[in-house]
């Protein structure tokens, strides 16, 4: 049974996220056993994947409503740079994650599942599957996510993708 509190709204969820990250940042990592460090690093990677899924969905919705125009920005990418103070390179990665939400539903689902796909692997798979005709892409991505769930690494996923194409 989980003792984690479920947030009541998005603001509360963001506060909990910041609190949890702050707790981890304040740990005396030098005094932690290697096994605990490894567990934290794996957990952070999983959290990063779930955050990427959330960011992609939020950016997709923000784009649809032309939210960037309210702040006088021409595009969501420039809005990200000026309003969230990220670099252009980071904004480009966020836009790639947005594309996952809009065009690669199976890969987005793989980000949300524990330890199935990392953000970097999902983005790589999206690049590889772009060459697959649209009517077959979702099925191909489902095959790749299932292979990742079964333990396939990036090399095996590349081979599967090459075979599908």
Feature roles, as predicted:
Residues 1-165:
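Conserved C-terminal region and hinge/linker of Rieske [2Fe-2S] proteins, especially
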């Amino acid at each position: 049974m989980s003792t984690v509190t479920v947030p009541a709204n998005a603001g509360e969820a963001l506060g909990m996220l910041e609190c949890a990250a702050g707790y981890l940042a304040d740990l005396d990592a030098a005094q932690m056993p290697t096994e605990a460090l490894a567990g934290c690093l794996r957990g952070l990677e999983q959290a990063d994947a779930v955050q990427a899924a959330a960011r992609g969905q939020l950016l997709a919705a923000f784009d649809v409503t032309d939210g960037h125009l309210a702040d006088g920005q021409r595009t969501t990418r420039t809005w990200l740079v000026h309003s969230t103070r990220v670099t252009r390179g980071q904004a480009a990665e966020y836009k790639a994650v947005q594309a996952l939400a809009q065009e690669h539903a199976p890969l987005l689902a793989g980000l949300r599942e524990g330890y199935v796909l990392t953000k970097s692997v999902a983005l790589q798979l999206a690049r590889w599957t772009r060459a697959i005709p649209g009517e077959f892409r979702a099925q191909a991505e489902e095959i790749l996510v299932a292979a990742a769930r079964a333990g396939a690494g990036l090399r095996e996923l590349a081979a599967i993708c090459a075979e599908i194409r």
